[in-house]
Amino acid sequence: MARIAGVNIPTAKRVVIALRYIHGIGPKFAQEICEKVGIPAERRVNQLTDAEVLQIRETIDRDYQVEGDLRRETSMNIKRLMDLGSYRGLRHRRSLPVRGQRTHTNARTRKGPAKAIAGKKK
């Protein structure tokens, strides 16, 4: 099993699909990485040589922000918004939808399970 960017990549899958297991690499970046390294998209991970795996690893380290670094940057951006006291930061702090969705009904995923209200019956 190949290990790239601290993630065990499944060996039986195609390289383009397997690279998506890394946080921060989606379909577009996976295809882009394969083109840069010169690996055909149909090639399976278990067919890669050690040199090709090393080349993929170096390309990702050099050109892309993935896994822990990406998660850290995202959380720092959210923390910055909260410290600024912006509207978006306030919504994050209150665990409400940030991008303008309605909250009168719905938004249960963001708000958590419904709280029981005493005396509220239909």
Swiss-Prot record:
Pfam families: Ribosomal_S13. Residues 97-122 are annotated as: Disordered. One of its GO terms (biological process) is translation. InterPro entries: Rbsml_uS13_C, Ribosomal_uS13, Ribosomal_uS13-like_H2TH, Ribosomal_uS13_bac-type, Ribosomal_uS13_CS. It comes from the Bacteria. Keywords: Ribonucleoprotein, Ribosomal protein, RNA-binding, rRNA-binding, tRNA-binding. GO terms for cellular component: cytosol; small ribosomal subunit. One of its GO terms (molecular function) is structural constituent of ribosome. Gene3D superfamilies: 1.10.8.50, 30s ribosomal protein s13, domain 2. Located at the top of the head of the 30S subunit, it contacts several helices of the 16S rRNA. In the 70S ribosome it contacts the 23S rRNA (bridge B1a) and protein L5 of the 50S subunit (bridge B1b), connecting the 2 subunits; these bridges are implicated in subunit movement. Contacts the tRNAs in the A and P-sites. Part of the 30S ribosomal subunit. Forms a loose heterodimer with protein S19. Forms two bridges to the 50S subunit in the 70S ribosome. PANTHER family: 30S RIBOSOMAL PROTEIN S13/40S RIBOSOMAL PROTEIN S18, SMALL RIBOSOMAL SUBUNIT PROTEIN US13M. Belongs to the universal ribosomal protein uS13 family. This is Small ribosomal subunit protein uS13. It comes from Rhizobium rhizogenes (strain K84 / ATCC BAA-868) (Agrobacterium radiobacter).
